[in-house]
């Protein structure tokens, strides 16, 4: 029996098709409360502490989001606070949504920008997204919830970061949050290079781009991450990582005693270690049942887990890395990229 299991069922999908999303862009489903109850019942015998969520892409996307929130609470042994991720799509279409979040005790809500209107709409994959984000910022402040802006940075949008500085200044976000006792936040980063974000590899930032990040955004970012330099936020160049890891003989088990499982609309199950994709698939909950899925997970039988447990780091890196690249990665994100590439190369 595992100490804790968290089950996340992608019941309704997502309104966006974001070009940065590590979870990937897959078709939306329309699963029911009975489906959520089924998923919870399957994993219930295998843990002393079960936590259930009705989403893993867009929170509160379904019209009955409040009922689903209550159902998740009844199916779970723990009740966490609402995530700081909120649905912009819902916020501008449901007059009761922000007030509901406020009553749940939400203090901070994170929103994602990529630059100005055209660029943000492009990366979000939906026209009108930028204007909806700005409207949501106003709604949050009206309800005394502090917005926190996350900015993904690539070569392609680095020159638009000043538009975000102008937005923060024009909307007077720091002072307006301070007025009700809140704190405005903002940070920039490149994210992990998996899912849709792996497609941005050719536009990945290098040390040359870091000098183009405006001082205001640098200051906010260092405060958010508790770091002293942007190098600590964006990581090392691939060339350095390659040099070090290409002689690394270690392997790694990716098994946890408190796993989180993502279940898609077809009831295929994946660990939340990377993009839900074939190399991470543990089985199908309806056809295989939770016991077989847990056996697959605990014994590292998914392709990606098996490779990471049995293949030295150096083999992954030498096979898939670029020894001359100046792209910036955190070590674990880089290893995840190497592992996903290696797995795909094996089956193609």
State each model region's role:
Residues 5-7, 48-52, 83-85, 109-111, ...:
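Hydrophobic faces of well-ordered beta-strands that scaffold small-molecule active sites
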Residues 30-31, 114, 126-131, 138-256, ...:
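Radical SAM enzyme [4Fe-4S]-AdoMet core and its adjacent flexible, acidic
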Residues 14-21, 257, 272, 343:
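Short cysteine clusters
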Residues 41-57:
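Short Fe-S-cluster ligation motifs
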Residues 41-46, 72-77, 99-106, 141-142, ...:
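Acidic (Asp/Glu)-rich catalytic clusters
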